[in-house]
Amino acid sequence: MILSLNSPNVAVPTAKYIRMSPSKIQRVLNQIRGKSYKESLMILEFMPYAACKPVLQAVQSAGANAQHNKGINKNDLVVSLASVDNGPVLRRFRPRAQGRGFKIQKFTSHIRIGVQKQVNF
């Protein structure tokens, strides 16, 4: 659970305009939410989905931001926020029979990954 996005122990980068459907990315994000930083990297490296590459880059960016900006060791990080939002839809038309045109929608996504220092009770 993320305490606050402005907390000194939280780093939340955003990967915008990823040319992939949000539903395909959501399937990957559900697997890493709540896992440790190192475990989420291992999961993403071995999952067979194309959505793993942009999510892996976002997780690595979150870890680098936490280490550089907040001074938190990467071994102490937990993926506390993993969400995907709809980006703009690119609309194209495909020529069809008898002069018709069918609409093709190319979806984009915005990925937010939040990592925070692990809280031990």
Swiss-Prot record:
Compartment(s) of residence: Plastid, Chloroplast
GO MF assignments: rRNA binding; structural constituent of ribosome
GO cellular-component term (any): chloroplast
Gene3D superfamilies for this protein: Ribosomal protein L22/L17 (3.90.470.10)
Keyword RNA-binding included in the entry's annotation: yes
PROSITE patterns per the UniProt record, alphabetical: RIBOSOMAL_L22
Keywords of this entry: Chloroplast, Plastid, Ribonucleoprotein, Ribosomal protein, RNA-binding, rRNA-binding
Transcription regulation is among the record's keywords: no
InterPro entries: Ribosomal_uL22 (IPR001063), Ribosomal_uL22_bac/chlpt-type (IPR005727), Ribosomal_uL22_bac/org-type (IPR047867), Ribosomal_uL22_CS (IPR018260), Ribosomal_uL22_sf (IPR036394)
GO biological process, alphabetically ordered: translation
SUPFAM superfamilies per UniProt: Ribosomal protein L22 (SSF54843)
Predominant location category: plastid
Purpose: This protein binds specifically to 23S rRNA. The globular domain of the protein is located near the polypeptide exit tunnel on the outside of the subunit, while an extended beta-hairpin is found that lines the wall of the exit tunnel in the center of the 70S ribosome.
Family according to the record: Belongs to the universal ribosomal protein uL22 family.
Oligomeric and partner information: Part of the 50S ribosomal subunit.
Protein name according to UniProt: Large ribosomal subunit protein uL22c
Organism for this UniProt entry: Guillardia theta (Cryptophyte)
